[in-house]
């Protein structure tokens, strides 16, 4: 899932898009470590389970988007019901819970309905980023 698609997906799902594309971060002369994005647990999941999401090394005070998606028919099919945004703290970190779904009705980043997504058979993932930075993707497997 590209950064452009992540921002577009978030705005399609009613999440306020950020105005900045990371120019302030690019203007800083301090070198930053590559961001880390993790989800725990990411396997043996059940429908409606809360997972812990952790981000570090991102830009401070920046808004990012997170969504559960799967490739369906050559396009991203994301869950608009759970897609949301989060903001990193002064050190570029964030920790929060996210509810994952074993199945959902997916939509493309443009908002076009794709149909049913079953994460028991599809390669579902949790992805995060904004138009300036892709934080990463973590594969989700359901038991």
UniProtKB/Swiss-Prot annotation:
A GO molecular function held by the record: DNA binding
Single GO biological process annotation from the record: defense response to bacterium
Disulfide bridge map: 69-78, 119-124
Endpoints of the signal sequence: 1-33
One Pfam family matching this protein: Neocarzinostat
Keywords: Antibiotic, Antimicrobial, Disulfide bond, DNA-binding, Signal
Stated role: Binds non-covalently to a chromophore which is the cytotoxic and mutagenic component of the antibiotic. The chromophore binds to DNA as a weak intercalator and causes single- and double-strand breaks.
Family statement drawn from the similarity comment of this UniProt entry: Belongs to the neocarzinostatin family.
Protein name as catalogued: Antitumor antibiotic C-1027 apoprotein
Organism the protein comes from: Streptomyces globisporus
């Amino acid at each position: 899932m590209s950064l452009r698609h992540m921002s577009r997906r978030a705005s399609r799902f009613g999440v306020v898009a950020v105005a900045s594309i990371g120019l302030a971060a690019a203007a800083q002369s301090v070198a930053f470590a590559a961001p880390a994005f993790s989800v725990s647990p990411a396997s043996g999941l059940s429908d409606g389970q809360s997972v812990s999401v952790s981000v570090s090394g991102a830009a401070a005070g920046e808004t990012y988007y997170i969504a559960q998606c799967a490739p369906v028919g050559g396009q991203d099919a994301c869950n608009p019901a759970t897609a949301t945004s989060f903001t990193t703290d002064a050190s570029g970190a964030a920790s929060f819970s996210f509810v994952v779904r074993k199945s959902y009705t997916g939509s493309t980043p443009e908002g076009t309905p794709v149909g049913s997504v079953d994460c028991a058979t599809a390669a579902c993932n949790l992805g995060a980023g904004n138009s300036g930075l892709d934080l990463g993707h973590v594969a989700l497997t359901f038991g």
